[in-house]
Amino acid sequence: MNEKSLRVLEFNKIKDELKKYTQTSAAKDLIERLHPYESAYEVREHLMETEEAFKISIKKGDAPFSGLYDIREAISKAQRRFTLFPSELLRVANLLRASRRFKGYVKSDDLSEKYEVLESITEGLVPLNGLEEEISKCIIGEEEISDRASTTLFNIRRSLKDKTSSIKARVNSLIRTYSSHLQENIYTVRGERYVLPVKVEHKGAVPGLVHDQSASGATLFIEPMSLVDLNNEIKELRLKEKAEIDRILAFLSGKVYENVDVIKVDADILWELDFIFAKAKYAQKLGAIMPIISEDGHFNIINAKHPLIDPKKVVENNIYLRDGITSVVITGPNTGGKTVTLKTVGLLHIMAMSGLMITASQGSTISFFKEVFADIGDEQSIEQSLSTFSSHMTNIVNIIDSADENSLVLFDELGAGTDPTEGAALAVSILENLRKRKTKVIATTHYSELKAYALKVDNVENASVEFDVETLRPTYRLLIGVPGKSNAFEISKRLGLPDYIIEDAREGISEETLKFEDLIQSLQHKNIKAQEHARKAESAKEEAVKLKEKYESKLDKFQDIREKAILNAQKEAKEIIKEAKEEADKILKDIRELERMGYSSDVRKLLEENRKKLKDKLEKTESKLNQPKEVGEAVTNVSEGDELYLPKFETKVMVLTNPDNKGDVQVQAGIMKIKVNIKDLRKTKETKIEKRQRKKKQMSLNLKSVATSVDLRGMDSEEATYTADKYLDDACMSGLSEVTIIHGKGTGVLRTAINDMLKRHPHVKSYRLGNYGEGGNGVTVVELK
């Protein structure tokens, strides 16, 4: 595709908008290289991937790109066996996490709705769960290594903590001893060593090593001799800590090196997916649709809108090139929307052929073209001193040299900028030449000669942009099949030009021309009325379809509920009948045995007893089938912590909140939290002893399974909040008193969301950011009630 047309049609602006929806700079690079594809097959394939991403993101929410970065530099370093920074390793882990999650994200359990293209792409993803877990365990922030990274690091940091506590106690004691010699009763740190701020005139009173002096010279920062050994020990521990961290980073970097080929493939696939889902997000923002792709050179774009014009201001138009037509000639006033129409046709074709959905209505058809040529606007070169006409003609010469039956050509004001007679003749000749080649052409013009040409010649159709004579404003509506009419007399009259001047002007025009213009005006009015009726009919049809879909949905839902109820009832009945049948078989077996033995009086008596037993059992079975299901006693007062029964789900629930003014409460049903009205709840028959035993057993089970921390890194705010909320419930039920939520440092968005949730969580007593060694700002430590 020629670059000039892409530039003139402003495809670069579309790509700039598309980049806003990517997560990585690698995906932005893919967008920068985006061009129309070279075959209709490729176009359909890439449109299908966009449509699948569009559908899956609506059904399942945003794709799992959270925490994904461009790691090309980290991959390059790993290939050269360099040690990676913690931030780089963390991003590698995030990429591996995204790989793992994406495979599940695109997998559909619904056989009727498969995401074949996306599933094919994600088949190449190879999650490295072990490496992901190893990095996540060791690195808890872009600059912080976890105490859990190794036993050695844990022991070093524990010793550091002990030594730091000792030196702080010692230095506080020295502050009290030397308080009269200090500028302030505080300690400070210079070169990672604890020192005291001693007045310069009292330096002899505090024996020790001078490390620094204040800017004013009034204070010396002295390390007392009694702190030297402790400071040395702390310094030594910090060096050991650094050495151990370097070893851990080198070890993890080595693991990345061992798997670098797999990681590189995963990264390439994820960046491609980032690009694909950016196309889907942009389509959602535009309200775009998946077009049908034809290869016959004809198209029908329904309610086409220019994607770069404000949606509140843009005018929709039906733009089509029907079967048997190769060229459309559009006439109408300046600023009437002719140029926008040309750009809309060209840009929507470029977008579709680049795998992007288009701003139009469902059912729209786009044709695949090998080339789209556009001579729009005045791109003359001042340096070349080209006139408007020369500039356009230079461009037209290039188009004539290259265009064929697989090309779409867009001409704006064909033949303008020179003598009208010669310009019109040239325009007709150019159109005729391209018509003979079967090149598809849309051209705008002011020349009446081109209107006449379109009326006389096969395969060429007239069109016009509508003009409202009452308001003297263009409506920007395109009328295909109707040539444009000159409105000079009507406009002049409404602006106040005397009638006698207008009449004199009319006399200068042939009667045939006037009749032709009147015919055009009549056609325009009829076309406008027909389109208005069509719009109303379409609106009524859409409303009817929506109502039909609404009630069909309700009917389907009712049918599902009914079938489920019948299925449950049948299942229960079968169980009861099965029990009765087993009992009956046993009795009949006994009867046959008795008959074989003969009929003594004792035997006959036993036989009658067994027959009566069978009869009673069957009567009980029938009674059980007809007996309504017991749902328990209704409740009137409900409090937080009550355990009740929810009949509609046939499960016990725990009440989490007191009733609001409508009687609604939040309850926990298994892993679900739902809101119900107290009238839907029933008392349980469970005794207090059973309840205590069950709770004790449940707590025992939970204590075995609930960890003391939860890792939320790589999740978005919504997923992280839900996961943390559920985790806190489980931790509380397990009897844990303190837990750690790992959210990472990053931009702070995740930490803020978690803090907002913790403020109002019923199980939270207090919370704080982690201390050094716990994870710092990358974790939040929560104390539970």
Swiss-Prot record:
Smr domain: from which residue to which, for each copy?
Answer: 710-785
Q: List the disulfide bonds.
A: none
Q: Which UniProt keywords apply?
A: ATP-binding, DNA-binding, Endonuclease, Hydrolase, Nuclease, Nucleotide-binding, RNA-binding, rRNA-binding
Instruction: Give the EC number(s) listed in the UniProt record.
Output: 3.1.-.-, 3.6.4.-
One Gene Ontology MF term? ribosomal large subunit binding
The record's annotation in Gene3D superfamilies points to: 3.30.1370.110, P-loop containing nucleotide triphosphate hydrolases
Q: How does it assemble?
A: Homodimer. Binds to stalled ribosomes, contacting rRNA.
Give the function comment from the record: Endonuclease that is involved in the suppression of homologous recombination and thus may have a key role in the control of bacterial genetic diversity. Acts as a ribosome collision sensor, splitting the ribosome into its 2 subunits. Detects stalled/collided 70S ribosomes which it binds and splits by an ATP-hydrolysis driven conformational change. Acts upstream of the ribosome quality control system (RQC), a ribosome-associated complex that mediates the extraction of incompletely synthesized nascent chains from stalled ribosomes and their subsequent degradation. Probably generates substrates for RQC.
PANTHER family in alphabetical order:
OS10G0509000 PROTEIN (PTHR48466:SF2), OS10G0509000 PROTEIN-RELATED (PTHR48466)
Entry-linked HAMAP family: MutS2
Q: What protein name applies here?
A: Endonuclease MutS2
Organism this protein belongs to: Clostridium novyi (strain NT)
